[in-house]
Curated annotation (Swiss-Prot):
The lineage of its organism: Bacteria, Pseudomonadati, Pseudomonadota, Gammaproteobacteria, Oceanospirillales. The record marks T102, R124 as: Interaction with substrate tRNA. NCBIfam families: miaA. Residues 36-39, 160-164, 242-247 are annotated as: Interaction with substrate tRNA. Belongs to the IPP transferase family. InterPro entries: Dimethylallyltransferase (IPR039657), IPT (IPR018022), P-loop_NTPase (IPR027417). Catalyzes the transfer of a dimethylallyl group onto the adenine at position 37 in tRNAs that read codons beginning with uridine, leading to the formation of N6-(dimethylallyl)adenosine (i(6)A). It comes from Marinomonas sp. (strain MWYL1). ATP binds at G11, P12, T13, A14, S15, G16, K17, T18. Gene3D superfamilies: 1.10.20.140, P-loop containing nucleotide triphosphate hydrolases. This is tRNA dimethylallyltransferase. Keywords: ATP-binding, Magnesium, Nucleotide-binding, Transferase, tRNA processing.
């Protein structure tokens, strides 16, 4: 490679990305940059499966705990931060290892951000009124009809992105998918090596997701959400509190669901998140996928990286 290289390690939730990243960092001259839209928030530790203090001591992660849950962090913010952090790491003679499951961030970094129309306040009021009358699920069905690819990537309980996809279509007559495909790649000062890790069997991933959610409940996830609930300045519609698990437990605290129902919905939402992440990964070009259950996972990943940089 003529340019320095950056390694991107992707994968669905609960696939073993963090464990592999820490192992790689201990065997190679890597520094880790988190690619996770939930890990940026301070105090959101249990429900995001934030790496433990022990793991962070072994392999520090950049772009973790950088903003309050009241604040907003966009894909554009991530691109700026990731490029800056990568250049800092490269200047030290080390290799950036970008690790996470927020595929939109990886996509924005590698393929650029599309030039889409500005938000239209009047149209947004109309869409919000429709949602209040019919529900966001009905608007998601509408999106499914004219842009099924975007609908597969946007959850019905993600009103911000759902509203934007409908707004863009009504303003331009073109789908969000159209704009994604028109993106202009950012001119990056480094090459990308793309890898993903996941179990070969989908059932194994589903079991991991369910077990991790129950483990998080045992670790005090409900108390963590309750702390945010009682702050008074956060709402369920903010990006931070829309994160998987937080939204469902917030609804329990609001009296909408019984706790057992909220937990069930949290597990289902986690599996749906994994499905959307896998949808992104299936269309990713030049991606090497590793089995997270392989006993030789670390040497296999290191050998692949070395084969790419020769």
């Amino acid at each position: 490679m003529t340019k320095p290289y950056v390694v991107c390690l992707m994968g669905p939730t609960a696939s073993g990305k963090t464990g592999l990243a820490v192992e790689l960092a201990e065997h190679h001259n890597f520094e880790i940059i988190s690619v996770d839209s939930a890990l940026v928030y301070k105090g959101m530790d249990i429900g995001t499966a934030k790496p433990s203090a022990e793991l962070l001591a072994r392999a520090p992660h950049r772009l973790i705990d950088i903003i309050d849950p009241l604040e907003f962090y966009s894909a554009a913010d991530f691109v700026l931060d990731a490029v800056e952090q990568s250049q800092e790491i490269l200047a030290k003679g080390k290799t950036p290892l970008l690790v996470g499951g927020t595929m939109m961030y990886f996509n924005a970094l590698q393929k650029g951000l599309a030039e889409m129309p500005q938000a239209d306040a009047e149209l947004r009021v109309i869409i919000e009124a429709e949602a209040a009358e019919k529900g966001w699920a009905a608007l998601h069905e509408e999106l499914q009809r004219f842009d099924p690819e975007a609908a597969s990537r946007i959850h019905p309980n993600d009103p911000q992105r759902l509203q934007r996809a409908i707004e863009v279509y009504r303003l331009t007559g073109k789908t969000m998918t159209h704009f994604w495909r028109q993106q202009e790649a950012v001119s990056l000062p480094f090459e990308m090596i793309n890898m993903a890790v996941m179990p070969k069997e989908r059932s194994v991933l589903h079991e991991r997701i369910e077990q991790r959610f129950y483990d998080m409940m045992d670790q005090g996830f409900l108390a963590e959400v309750e702390g945010f609930y009682r702050r008074g300045d956060l709402t369920i519609d903010m990006p931070s509190m829309r994160c998987v698990g937080y939204r469902q437990l917030w609804q329990y605290l609001d009296g909408v669901d019984l706790l057992e129902d909220a937990i069930f919905k949290g597990v289902v939402a986690s599996r749906q998140l994994a499905k959307r992440q896998l949808t992104w990964l299936r269309g990713w070009e030049d991606l090497m996928i590793f089995d997270s259950l392989s006993k030789d996972l670390v040497p296999e990943a290191l050998n692949y990286i070395e084969s790419r940089i020769i």
